[in-house]
């Protein structure tokens, strides 16, 4: 019987199943960070248990670490969590990329970089954006702290079999339109709940033409569509990215692995529970204007009024968004000014993202009223960017160049947006208070964020493509 790639990976990992019951899945890779792991390790300690497969477990610290003076953690809770992760990994024999390691970074950036993330794997982490790893043709999803403990002790997890959703985007993207714009356009068209109960497979010409960095951006925000996970079938782009990575198979073993990975594709005749189709030619640079990622518009559009929403609940949420965000109905997106720019997060902090941003700003200066920061997703990204001279472009333009970490994506560290101020952010969530109490977040691509920093407001990057090319 023809199967989707989602069904193939799921079936390969079922340890136990029962009619009408969740399946017990074997987990190939468990990624751990400092925030959701302390209670899980303590649970093991209290029960006298060991980590079942420490070789299948990898930890790093990312959420609440400073990106300036990274070894001086002033927040007491953050300091305790980082210290606990160091002690727990030492006690239970788990690999740890700590603040002194060149392998340290955002967990969803370093997993792929190190070759831990590979096609066909089941991958979990105590973080909702674990779906990022689906870009490799892996089944990857976030779990809660109690589930973290369960995976640590058993290397398995009970899960309800998901429905399958195909999102197909064909055509050719306009210059200046990026992977971030594609996934924001999908969410804008269908809302933040349409993926509930599904795992998404992204198909079509647009995704096939993306780099692995770009595919990770798309899969990262599957969660903002309400989905459990999202993935893209592996191909030559995937295989070449994985080749030679630290923990990937090497030599003949890698070639043998490719033979297996080539089978990880949806069979002809396989059916999805639902299919959504978009035209890539019609996608524009996108900007969120409200308080969830579905409140998003092309940069050359205007904010809708309450009368533009058919449902009363949507009208009420729009009114709340106007008040919180300090915007008004029918205001042009290009008339919105910003005070902060954040280029970083597990969504957009990789080399492709930094190159895109740098290509837009070279030889220009950040607007006087704007504070702009660039936070590489890992120490490896930081070092590579510095080798290419990207940091000089950012610094000369007036950006701050930071150490790796989650940073301003979430207000769990020193990098926050002050109350009532507005940030053009390459992160994945624009909820109320996400970047700080009263902070106003607009989600955009790295290219859009970079140009907002220069102009002090949102501008259409397509207008600048005669001089600046987004790579």
Swiss-Prot record:
GO terms for biological process: L-leucine biosynthetic process. Its EC number is 4.2.1.33. Pathway: Amino-acid biosynthesis; L-leucine biosynthesis; L-leucine from 3-methyl-2-oxobutanoate: step 2/4. GO terms for molecular function: 3-isopropylmalate dehydratase activity; 4 iron, 4 sulfur cluster binding; metal ion binding. Keywords: 4Fe-4S, Amino-acid biosynthesis, Branched-chain amino acid biosynthesis, Iron, Iron-sulfur, Leucine biosynthesis, Lyase, Metal-binding. It catalyses: (2R,3S)-3-isopropylmalate = (2S)-2-isopropylmalate. Gene3D superfamilies: Aconitase, domain 3. CDD domains: IPMI. [4Fe-4S] cluster binds at residues 346, 406, 409. Its cofactor is [4Fe-4S] cluster. It is an enzyme of class 4 (lyase). InterPro entries: 3-IsopropMal_deHydase_lsu (IPR004430), Acnase/IPM_dHydase_lsu_aba_1/3 (IPR015931), Acoase/IPM_deHydtase_lsu_aba (IPR001030), Aconitase_4Fe-4S_BS (IPR018136), Aconitase_4Fe-4S_dom (IPR036008), IPM_dehydratase_rel_enz (IPR050067), IPMI_cat (IPR033941). It comes from the Bacteria. Binds 1 [4Fe-4S] cluster per subunit. Belongs to the aconitase/IPM isomerase family. LeuC type 1 subfamily. Catalyzes the isomerization between 2-isopropylmalate and 3-isopropylmalate, via the formation of 2-isopropylmaleate. Heterodimer of LeuC and LeuD. This is 3-isopropylmalate dehydratase large subunit. It comes from Bacillus pumilus (strain SAFR-032). The gene is leuC.
């Amino acid at each position: 019987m023809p199967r989707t790639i989602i069904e193939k990976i799921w079936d390969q990992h079922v340890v136990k199943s029962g009619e009408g019951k969740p399946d017990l899945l074997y987990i190939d890779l468990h990624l751990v960070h400092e925030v959701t792991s302390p209670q899980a390790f303590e649970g093991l300690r209290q029960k006298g248990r060991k980590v079942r497969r420490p070789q299948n477990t990898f930890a790093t610290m990312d959420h609440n670490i400073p990106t300036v003076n990274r070894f001086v953690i002033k927040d007491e809770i953050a300091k305790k969590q980082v210290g606990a992760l160091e002690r727990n990994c030492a006690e239970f024999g788990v690999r740890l990329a700590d603040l002194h390691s060149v392998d340290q970074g955002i967990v969803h950036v370093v997993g792929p970089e190190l070759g831990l993330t590979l096609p066909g794997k089941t991958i979990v982490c105590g973080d909702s954006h674990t779906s990022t790893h689906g870009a490799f043709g892996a089944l990857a999803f976030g779990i809660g702290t109690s589930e973290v403990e369960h995976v640590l002790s058993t290397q398995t997890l009970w899960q309800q079999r998901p429905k399958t959703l195909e999102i197909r985007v064909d055509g050719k993207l306009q210059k200046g339109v990026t992977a971030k714009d594609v996934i924001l356009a999908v969410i804008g068209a269908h809302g933040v709940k349409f993926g509930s109960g599904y795992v998404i497979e992204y198909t079509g010409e647009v995704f096939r033409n993306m780099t692995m960095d770009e595919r990770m951006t798309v899969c990262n925000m599957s969660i903002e569509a309400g989905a459990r996970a999202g993935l893209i079938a592996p191909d030559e782009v995937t295989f070449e990215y994985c080749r030679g990575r630290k923990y990937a198979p090497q030599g003949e073993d890698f070639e043998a692995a490719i033979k297996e990975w080539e089978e990880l594709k949806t069979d002809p005749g396989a059916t999805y529970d639902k299919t959504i189709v978009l035209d890539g030619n019609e996608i524009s640079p996108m900007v969120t204007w409200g308080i969830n990622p579905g409140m998003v518009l092309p940069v050359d559009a205007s904010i809708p009024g309450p009368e533009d929403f058919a449902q009363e609940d949507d009208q009420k949420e729009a009114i709340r968004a106007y008040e919180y965000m300090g915007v008004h109905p029918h205001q042009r997106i290009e008339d919105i000014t910003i005070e902060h720019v954040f280029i970083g997060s597990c969504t957009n902090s990789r080399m492709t993202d930094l190159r895109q941003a740098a290509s837009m700003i070279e030889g220009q200066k950040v607007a006087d009223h704007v504070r702009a920061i660039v936070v590489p997703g890992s120490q490896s990204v930081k070092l590579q960017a510095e080798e290419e001279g990207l940091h000089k472009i950012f610094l000369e333009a007036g950006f701050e160049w930071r150490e790796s970490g989650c940073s301003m994506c979430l207000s769990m560290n020193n990098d926050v947006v002050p109350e009532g101020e507005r940030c053009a952010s390459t992160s994945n969530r624009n909820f109320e208070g996400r970047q700080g109490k009263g902070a106003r977040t607009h989600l955009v691509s790295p290219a859009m964020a970079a140009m907002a920093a220069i102009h002090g407001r949102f501008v259409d990057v397509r207008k600048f493509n005669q001089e600046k090319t987004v790579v």
